[in-house]
UniProtKB/Swiss-Prot annotation:
PROSITE patterns: ZF_RING_CH. A zinc finger (RING-CH-type) spans 56-119. E3 ubiquitin-protein ligase which may be involved in endosomal trafficking. E3 ubiquitin ligases accept ubiquitin from an E2 ubiquitin-conjugating enzyme in the form of a thioester and then directly transfer the ubiquitin to targeted substrates. Keywords: Cell membrane, Cytoplasm, Endocytosis, Endoplasmic reticulum, Endosome, Golgi apparatus, Lysosome, Membrane, Metal-binding, Transferase, Transmembrane, Transmembrane helix, Ubl conjugation pathway, Zinc, Zinc-finger. Pathway: Protein modification; protein ubiquitination. Its main location: endoplasmic reticulum. It is a multi-pass membrane protein. The RING-CH-type zinc finger domain is required for E3 ligase activity. The chain crosses the membrane at residues 141-161, 178-198. This is E3 ubiquitin-protein ligase MARCHF2. Its EC number is 2.3.2.27. GO terms for biological process: endocytosis; hemopoiesis; protein ubiquitination. GO terms for cellular component: cytoplasmic vesicle; endoplasmic reticulum; endoplasmic reticulum membrane; endosome membrane; Golgi membrane; lysosomal membrane; plasma membrane.
Amino acid sequence: MTTGECCHLPGSLCDCTGNAALSKTVEEADNRRAQYVTQVTAKDGRLLSTVIKALGTQSDRPICRICHEGQDVCNSEGLLSPCDCTGTLGTVHKSCLEKWLSSSNTSYCELCHTEFTIERRPRPLTEWLRDPGPRNEKRTLFCDMVCFLFITPLAAISGWLCLRGAQDHLHFNSRLEAVGLIALTIALFTIYVLWTLVSFRYHCQLYSEWRRTNQKVRLLIPDTKGAHSTQHSLLSTKLLKKTADETIV
């Protein structure tokens, strides 16, 4: 970058007359990052002010359209182009796409509607027991489990006592009391079985819905598709760099 002989600081007033001309040059810094240099000079060529702005290199690289990050160097996870989208929307991380397909419960691109080759695996029951979903479903599951653990032994003991009392009444020829205790036992077990079946069916429906919408998705990419993705990523990088160079010039 060339400097003039004007001793004024940038931003200060100058007694030089004439219209100011604008010239732009490009320099290479020590860290090899492009810098955008704007020089404001007077009509006689003396430098009035200089504005230097380093250009970021992130825009020159393809990024993931989901997380908006570039290639993950730490995990060695590159960018893929598994669908027909082009430009900045054509590259994506495999892990990001798998999480998106799992959360959205779809198997195609929402932009170009390309069907992905995926493998779905249901999550285990223990994971649903730890996190069944919304707060009201958690509370319902917890209450039903506590009631089941409390009512089951209580119903068993009550039924055994009623049957034992009915047997004693039959032994002493008190048939009316015996029939009443037997009817009470049948009613008790009927209510217990109906409540258990209704609660079990309700939670089975919740688990089936959770299992259907919360699956582990694994993206299957053929080798030919992977090679095409690499070429597409390299081509996108070259095009973006070429566009950036033309913009700077």
